[in-house]
């Protein structure tokens, strides 16, 4: 289903010497999703790959959680646009949304912003205590950690022959 928007989100990524760090500008911003424009979509699993904090409201998250398994990438929930610049935001009321999320994908920075923990196991346990059923934490070259039903599963990273651009690695993992 195509949901019309006045614009499509358009980012400019600016990288320095460290490919794991970037700054971003938003040159165009799409309209947020609403219950009305998502209401008739039926699926077993809904994945929210949000780009910015206001893409999906708490009401939309609650609504979709009643229709099927709800998966989300925390990335977009933790950044907002001021002017054209993308800025990290604190968890605000995002903890409220977590109890409706079945599967949550975060990276190391996102887990720390959400939980205050820099230890992946502590962060995963905290997210689960807040209601997330399955926590996926990407750890860059160290692979990833999955926490589900009280158990940890470590997945090693696959070393590439050459790193050209790290853009989209988290999105690819979530897919």
Where do the model's predicted regions map?
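Short, charged, surface-exposed secondary-structure boundary motifs
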Residues: 10-12, 79-84, 163-167
């Amino acid at each position: 289903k195509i949901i019309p928007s006045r614009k499509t989100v358009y980012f400019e990524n600016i990288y320095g010497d460290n490919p794991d760090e970037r700054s971003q500008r938003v040159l165009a911003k799409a309209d947020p999703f609403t219950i009305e424009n998502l209401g008739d979509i039926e699926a077993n699993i809904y994945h929210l790959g949000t780009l910015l904090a206001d893409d999906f409201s708490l009401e939309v998250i609650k609504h979709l959680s009643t229709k099927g398994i709800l998966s989300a990438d925390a990335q977009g929930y933790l950044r907002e646009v001021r002017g054209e610049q993308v800025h990290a935001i604190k968890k605000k009321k995002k903890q409220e949304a977590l109890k409706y999320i079945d599967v949550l994908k975060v990276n190391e920075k996102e887990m720390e912003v959400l939980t205050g923990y820099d230890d992946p196991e502590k962060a995963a346990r905290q997210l689960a205590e807040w209601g997330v059923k399955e926590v996926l934490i990407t750890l860059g070259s160290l692979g990833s950690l999955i926490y589900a039903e009280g158990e940890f599963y470590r997945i090693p990273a696959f070393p590439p022959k050459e790193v050209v651009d790290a853009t989209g690695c988290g999105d690819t993992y979530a897919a």
